Amino acid sequence: MKYNDLRDFLTLLEQQGELKRITLPVDPHLEITEIADRTLRAGGPALLFENPKGYSMPVLCNLFGTPKRVAMGMGQEDVSALREVGKLLAFLKEPEPPKGFRDLFDKLPQFKQVLNMPTKRLRGAPCQQKIVSGDDVDLNRIPIMTCWPEDAAPLITWGLTVTRGPHKERQNLGIYRQQLIGKNKLIMRWLSHRGGALDYQEWCAAHPGERFPVSVALGADPATILGAVTPVPDTLSEYAFAGLLRGTKTEVVKCISNDLEVPASAEIVLEGYIDPGEMAPEGPYGDHTGYYNEVDSFPVFTVTHITQREDAIYHSTYTGRPPDEPAVLGVALNEVFVPILQKQFPEIVDFYLPPEGCSYRLAVVTIKKQYAGHAKRVMMGVWSFLRQFMYTKFVIVCDDDVNARDWNDVIWAITTRMDPARDTVLVENTPIDYLDFASPVSGLGSKMGLDATNKWPGETQREWGRPIKKDPDVVAHIDAIWDELAIFNNGKSA
């Protein structure tokens, strides 16, 4: 499935009953969030609010509110197919030359996909059909949502922020929330280790006192949106990855006021700059932890131009205690992570980020254990291999006889295979999510690893327990006579 733009994707969703148009007037202040939250928790469709109160621009919510729609956005039929996306990323992260003709033939599809990586630059684009600049710029005309009662102000949530460092050819795409503080002013909340913030820091060092160009695209095609939240290798641009997903080159266009390139089909583009030293207090906002975060200062983004399509659609979301849209994305992208981790650690059987763990704060890993201390090596690998897991607070490692996605299995392994003192690893003074108020210092906290594997010689001096297993002959016999027993009157029981 290929989508040229967001509207193509919405057409398909509507045809499949995955999009609901809301014609009743609904307020972007709190009301859209309430409707979207109820719908997402019920596994419902994407929502297009055609008449937001006080605005003429429709609001799109819950676009990726189910794992199925995330898979569709990546051009796949279902979530299980996302493993193939992960295998492609693993290949791109550490490409290997073919070992022979047969291997070359097997890898041919991957090499063919690479042809879609370069971007296609357009002279004109749909995202520039309407242009507003200077004093005419007014962000208040966009139906920016206020999601929770104690939120400080309306908040842009799905903007793809485009930046470029002074020493880089490649642009960075990142998703950072942006608080509305004026008709042409937003607060750019990016954490110091994120790509946009790093580009900004390098710019300030190379060009002291000079304005840093920034553009924000809203309502890009699904492949580009998802490319910005997927763990692409550092050497691969998000646009290139979007081309791989889509099967066609990503079309971009140069901005009106700067040299940054934005998705040509985006619904809305905000162009402007950050003035070094211009900061503002951001928050509080309800976030994916289920709490309001503390107030902190971040750079101010001044918008000089707004370009948009005719009849533009504003793409938005909310974040709150899981399940929310980021949690759903986490469930789907979990399938992408598995092959990438297995490429580096072949002993990994499965990897799971429970959505109730706020998408990434707790990971369960199952392995084919091969030696004493193996579980601890895997813990350290998870924390260090992909930057997406630098904020993971808890890593639980189990044997491959445990289902990583079944809490009954995981809790059984923890309570029967762990000694708290011997099998718990604590690491202090590590990077922690700024939003994690449980850490003693903002951005710095501890991590815990739990070794819930069977212990090998060298890890214990005691005889290890042998799991109870049923007699297969008895099981087969009881299966054969189960219906005659009529215990439940409905055939076999679990």
From Swiss-Prot:
SUPFAM superfamilies: FMN-binding split barrel, UbiD C-terminal domain-like. One of its GO terms (molecular function) is metal ion binding. Its EC number is 4.1.1.98. It is an enzyme of class 4 (lyase). It comes from the Bacteria. GO terms for biological process: ubiquinone biosynthetic process. Prenylated FMN binds at I175, Y176, R177, R189, W190, L191, R194, G195. It is found in: Cell membrane. InterPro entries: UbiD, UbiD-like_C, UbiD-like_N, UbiD_bacteria, UbiD_Rift_dom. Pathway: Cofactor biosynthesis; ubiquinone biosynthesis. Keywords: Cell membrane, Decarboxylase, Flavoprotein, FMN, Lyase, Manganese, Membrane, Metal-binding, Ubiquinone biosynthesis. The keyword Cell membrane applies. It is a peripheral membrane protein. Binds 1 prenylated FMN per subunit. The keyword Manganese applies. HAMAP family: UbiD. Belongs to the UbiD family. Homohexamer. This is 3-octaprenyl-4-hydroxybenzoate carboxy-lyase. The gene is ubiD.
